[in-house]
Structures are given as structure tokens and as C-alpha cells.
Amino acid sequence: MKFAISSSILSQRLQTLGRVIASKNSMPILDNFLFQVHDNHLELTASDSELTLHTTLELIESDGPIDFTVNAKTIQDAIKEIPEQPLEFTVDPDNLDITVTYQNGHYNLVGQNAQEYPLTPDLEGEISTLGADAARLFSGINRALFAAADDPLRPVMNGVFFDFNTDGLAVVASDGRKLSCTRLLDVTTDTPASFILHKKPANIVRNILQKEVGDVTIRFNGRNAVIASECYDLSCRLIEGKFPNYNSVIPKDNPNLVTLNRTAMIAALRRVLIFSNAGSPLVKLHIEAGRLVLSTRDADYGRSGEEALACQYEGQPMNIGFKGTLLMELLNNLEGEEIVVQLADPSRAGIIVPAEQHEHEHVLMLLMPMMLND
């Protein structure tokens, strides 16, 4: 049996599917990609037993249906070394010997029986179905992932929370010290629903959506979710448990408002952090009318750094401390030229938002303060 396909398109899809393959699988067959040829199309599948990614490609030609699996790393590494050209696969249906022929050579591989490959069960029970714009969903997940925890004692914090309600879809992650929340205001539902996506599938969805256009369909029940874009279908197990009430930790009354240039803030913060204590990089923010002063000190080595930035400030003069490395993370995961820092007092969380929000979107970052010694 033979079929032909573009080398660059196949390589691109295999590279994406390869992110699913675990370094150590409970089932040896999961070290393989599943190939299914029918109706002049090639369906490719990768799985680690809890996460399955599926894509369909159009073939240049084929002379019949066949299913087989082949080692993922071998085929992935081999195909990516071939420049764009048609590849011809010849598969012996009896012993699954595979020959991949290209312009200047060929590869010989041995496949395995596709019947050994585990099938992904369909969603059952009460299923919620919603849609979202691929580009905005990418932005929400991209902003959230850095804030997710890595805490075996609190597994619900180790992923990205999707909260659908009448106000829109909130894409949230937090590790207890920092929080990222992106609200997609045009994704609404009359029946509130939510789920927590593990970091691994969230990372894969982010990588997929970076190149996708149009709408994404999200279907989920209490245990599993299916996220379908134009080119990929991802099925995965969800994190079970209740995500904390993130709205309750966001201060509502923040009369002190600092507006300043985000890029200038990042550059100044990077410079003063050189002089901070490596174990506890505390950065002090002194805010007064017209300027914000960043300062750090490392008493162990007798060094310190200070830099002033121009800003617009509405409020009383204030000193507040933050962990500098976390503040840098927040600023790097925001967009736009100007940001607004919203503060209540030095003991409460600081909120950072873009000065201008995108249409149908509201972005908010939160950072818990550190105690100042002076």
C-alpha cells in the first residue's frame, strides 16, 4: 500500500504531536504515532494516556486504506531533515515494513499493529459546549501559564482555570503569590461552568493556537475536555477539585493609581535587581507625585541600587515592597506601552493592568507584597 504527502506539512504536524509523547510511557505503544490512511487523508494521533492530540492531513495520493503505528522520535527526527518535497510511504500490510522514499534516498522502518493503540473515549454525561476566538484564547492561556503553581499538595493550583459565566470567560492561574486573569468578554453563557486544565495540555493548546485563526470549540464534562481548532483536536483529563475563589483575593478599592511606561519599568527593574539579595530579591517602590523610585539592597555584600522613573500618580505618597523577580515576570507577560498599578496600601496585593485594554478583553495581574524593614 502506498501514499504520498508533503514533507514540510507532515514534519510540522509531527513536531506538534511530538510534544504529547511522554519520556516514559506506561504502555510501549504510546512511544509511537498512530497513522490512519483513508479517503485520501492521513489521520495522525499522539497520546500519553491522559492527553491525546489528533490531526488530519490531505494526501497527494493514496491507493487504499491502512492503519499502523511507528516510533515517534524516529519518524519525527527523520522527516524534519528532509527539505520540502513529496514523500512516498510504502507499507507492507502483512508485516508493516515501511519504506519512506524521497528525492535522494529512502528510510526503512518497522511499524506496529494499530489495534494495540488505545482509543480515546467520547465525552459522556452532561457536556458543556462553548466557542472562543483562537487568537484571544491563545493570549489568555499565554498570560496565565507563568502564574500556575507546581505544588503537589495543592493540585488544583497546578493548571489553568477556565471559568465560564454571564460576564465572559475568565482564564486564570495563580500560585498564591501571583495571579493572572484574562476575561474574554464576548464568550458568555447562561449556565456557569468551569474546569482546570493541566499545564501540559495548556502548553500544547497555546502552541497550537499561536498559528490558528477562527473559532475554537471547547467541550467538557466533569472529568475530561475536548478542544478543537481548525487543524487539531485535543482530548485530555482534567484536574479534579475546586479552584479557589480568585475574585475574593482581588482588592476592590484601590485609590492609589500609578501610570507609567512598561518597557522603562522593566529596564529599570532589571538594572536594580543586579544589586538585590539573590535569596530574597526585595524591591522597594517609593511612589510620590510625578515619580516612582525603585531601590534594592544586599546587606550581605554591602551593595545597593536605586533608579527613578517618571510616572503619573493619583494618591498619597507610599512605600511598598515586591519580590523583584516576580514583578519582572508580571511585567513581561503584559502587553502595551503603558500600565496602571493599582494600590490600596502596603499590606495588600498590588494590581497591574494595561492602560488600554483590547476590545472584548480585560487583563489583570496581581502580586502579593513583601514586608519592608524600614
Label each residue range with its predicted role:
Residues 1-374:
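Structural preference for solvent-exposed beta-strand-turn elements
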